Amino acid sequence: MSIPFTRWPEEFARRYREKGYWQDLPLTDILTRHAASDSIAVIDGERQLSYRELNQAADNLACSLRRQGIKPGETALVQLGNVAELYITFFALLKLGVAPVLALFSHQRSELNAYASQIEPALLIADRQHALFSGDDFLNTFVTEHSSIRVVQLLNDSGEHNLQDAINHPAEDFTATPSPADEVAYFQLSGGTTGTPKLIPRTHNDYYYSVRRSVEICQFTQQTRYLCAIPAAHNYAMSSPGSLGVFLAGGTVVLAADPSATLCFPLIEKHQVNVTALVPPAVSLWLQALIEGESRAQLASLKLLQVGGARLSATLAARIPAEIGCQLQQVFGMAEGLVNYTRLDDSAEKIIHTQGYPMCPDDEVWVADAEGNPLPQGEVGRLMTRGPYTFRGYYKSPQHNASAFDANGFYCSGDLISIDPEGYITVQGREKDQINRGGEKIAAEEIENLLLRHPAVIYAALVSMEDELMGEKSCAYLVVKEPLRAVQVRRFLREQGIAEFKLPDRVECVDSLPLTAVGKVDKKQLRQWLASRASA
């Protein structure tokens, strides 16, 4: 039994195999190639697992789940945080030929119900330390409402569902049965900020290539010691090159529960971490922590800081080498496929001011206008892409696929970009972030980047607010070091030489900005704040 999904046309699949992108290997190969190694694969608090131990634990769990009736071709819903059991579970399910959805630990009732409704899982794996599963009320209701669930395993459980017991029970003559390499390996989550994230089917072939090529570009080796402080289940942390890239290279993943400086700085020093990945808000927190007295000596081993998940302003980018003392690599990718990196030997100009260029020669990327017509080089428009690791359709979502893809199979991500003569991409924002003020279009990220130049501004987010006369006006939400008045903000922006219509109509200074589950500023919530105040 195989999971239905939108496949690549045969001529594309043949070309990707001929060029060596697709090598018909299951993702389990990332781990099993090191199965005899006693090198440390994962550090989780005081626990350390070698590659041999990680592989054996995955075999044990897979064998236990098979005994409980879980079969190839079925699906699983998994919600685990930044713990070693996430990787044990991931590889165990791949070995069984079971395709999981890896829900983020921050997801709640609505998201879990939506995922379960879409994939009809046979298996649920969760953690008693999550508020939803701390008791049995939600669990019982969830399993009743989603009757496809036959098996439940819970981390930190003392009863019949104990995941740790299943992991510790020795495997008996276990033989892996991964799904074929051109079938669905697992589901990633769309990074969209509106509604429940859509499900993205990723095959072994396309995802393995993405990991393998990322490892080559980022030069991960057995000496790589990677701090995973962003959500480990997120695509960025899994494959760019992420933890899977570390495992492929034979390096070590060090897990952190969150990206706070107070937690991460000591871990970097203790485990001699040499690479990590952050989202821009976390970069700001690290820089602020150093200003406030955290010792930079703790970061002496850190050689490379990847930043992605949202566009990094040039202002912040320029501070990283000088203040953190390591090389910056910008990452612009999407769970749907396409990944762009600045290269390690790029000029400072490219690293600071662009988001890199595609990692595969067969990544087809162009810029379209609102009607889908190609735009000249350098102009800002909608990103269109297809390639050997960019999917061809969301799972069970024909209506959305009809608008997300053009007739030639190019995916429209909703990102607004420009491409320079050398192929480097600069992200200008999102279509939905464009504010239409009386017919004048304002790209929110342009104003946000200018606001971040102000010495008193730590974070900035520009959102639209409804206006009876203009249709929309703009509101700037700021997290500041010292009080700022709207008149001061507008004066500063005027000094940057921008048009008057781009000046924020309203300025709100707040203690913090709300974030989505993947660490991006939650502009939907900011707009809701405005709407609630307007109706009060």
UniProtKB/Swiss-Prot annotation:
GO terms for cellular component: cytosol; membrane. Pathway: Siderophore biosynthesis; enterobactin biosynthesis. CDD domains: 23DHB-AMP_lg (cd05920). Keywords: Acyltransferase, ATP-binding, Enterobactin biosynthesis, Ligase, Membrane, Nucleotide-binding, Transferase. Induction: Under conditions of iron deficiency and by the fur protein. It is an enzyme of class 6 (ligase). PROSITE patterns: AMP_BINDING. It catalyses: 3 2,3-dihydroxybenzoate + 3 L-serine + 6 ATP = enterobactin + 6 AMP + 6 diphosphate + 4 H(+); 2,3-dihydroxybenzoate + holo-[ACP] + ATP = 2,3-dihydroxybenzoyl-[ACP] + AMP + diphosphate; 2,3-dihydroxybenzoyl-5'-AMP + holo-[ACP] = 2,3-dihydroxybenzoyl-[ACP] + AMP + H(+). This is Enterobactin synthase component E. It comes from Escherichia coli (strain K12).
